[in-house]
């Protein structure tokens, strides 16, 4: 990769493990950012329903930011990575019936875009239209597909990210241009640890996706008993209404720009991620390294991280430390787990 271009972990100074003495600051109620107060209300209600570490878990932040990113020029493509039964699906269920939210449980190579004359272009052009949020609660099934099917699905996701394209056949060539889709799609995909096998191969998913490693809170037997016998359970309809209100209000608060220091931090992080995700070829027998490919260019990563940070600021405001903490967690999550452990 070139010694002069390598970014060290010390240069980036990422606090990937989290500092227990550096919790998100508590502001006085009179000074609190309005959307932040609404966010806390939603999170507190979820904590009555699920086991949540409200100080160190940023799943609600990340999902909310991805939803409001559809208002950006380039919406977010986010992978929520976590073990089965870690709460990912429960969070995503809270978005059901939200405007422009579309959930798919099964993907084939011809689901999102299709050249069939009766398909109206596929699910994205025909159902989602020009703008929407695509949610796949179990993207692991896609990773389990055969390589040819998987690559075709990845190709269609790249079209969705780029905001223009479609699928054509050799029969109806006269209508190819008319079938081309243009729009903006934000994506929220839930996936297990299997995604780690693909992070090391940037050519498969490219630098379009961001990742968030969601670690379920570990509790002991007494805590589990106390939680399971709680009388207080949130009203899901009320909770969904507040989430919808939070998203609407946050969309209106999206900042146009971010401070220069934060822009430099994000670009440095994007370059660091790109270097850590560089593809390495090894000998099949000896496992010796044969070739380290040039890292991907960080421009799309930089754009995605910048968009994420803007959305987090729209939720929490500039005075809160929570946007930077959530951003840092995503930066660490974008690096393959094994390589992350090595640099730690």
What are these regions (language model features)?
Residues 1-44, 102, 128:
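Replication-associated primase and helicase/ATPase modules
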């Amino acid at each position: 990769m070139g010694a002069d271009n390598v970014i060290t972990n010390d240069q980036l100074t990422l606090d990937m493990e989290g500092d227990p003495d550096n919790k998100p600051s508590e502001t006085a109620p009179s000074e609190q950012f309005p959307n932040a107060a609404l966010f806390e209300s939603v999170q507190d209600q979820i904590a009555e329903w699920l086991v949540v570490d409200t100080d160190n878990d940023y799943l609600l932040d990340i999902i909310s930011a991805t939803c409001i990113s559809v208002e950006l020029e380039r919406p977010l493509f986010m992978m929520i990575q976590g073990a089965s039964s870690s709460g990912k699906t429960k969070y995503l269920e809270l978005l059901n019936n939200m405007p422009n939210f579309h959930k798919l449980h099964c993907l084939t190579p011809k689901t999102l875009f299709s050249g069939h004359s009766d398909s109206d272009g596929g699910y994205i052009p025909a159902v989602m239209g020009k703008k929407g949020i695509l949610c796949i609660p179990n993207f692991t099934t896609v990773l389990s597909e055969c390589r040819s099917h998987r690559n075709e699905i990845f190709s269609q996701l790249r079209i969705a990210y780029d905001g223009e394209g479609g699928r054509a056949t050799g029969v109806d060539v006269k209508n190819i241009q008319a079938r081309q889709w243009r729009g903006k799609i934000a994506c929220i995909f839930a996936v297990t640890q299997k995604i780690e096998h693909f992070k090391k191969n940037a050519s498969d998913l490219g630098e379009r996706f961001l990742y968030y490693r969601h670690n379920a809170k570990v509790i002991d037997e007494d805590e589990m008993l106390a939680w399971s016998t709680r009388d207080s359970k949130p009203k899901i309809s009320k909770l969904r209404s507040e989430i919808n209100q939070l998203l609407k209000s946050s969309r209106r608060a999206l900042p146009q720009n971010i401070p220069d220091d934060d822009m430099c931090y994000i670009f440095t992080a994007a370059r660091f991620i790109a270097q850590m995700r560089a593809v390495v070829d090894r000998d099949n027998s000896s496992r010796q390294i044969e070739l380290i490919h040039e890292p991907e260019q960080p421009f799309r990563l930089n754009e995605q991280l910048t968009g994420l940070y803007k959305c987090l600021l729209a939720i929490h405001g500039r005075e809160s430390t929570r946007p930077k903490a959530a951003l840092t967690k995503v930066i660490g999550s974008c690096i393959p787990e094994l390589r992350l452990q090595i640099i730690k």
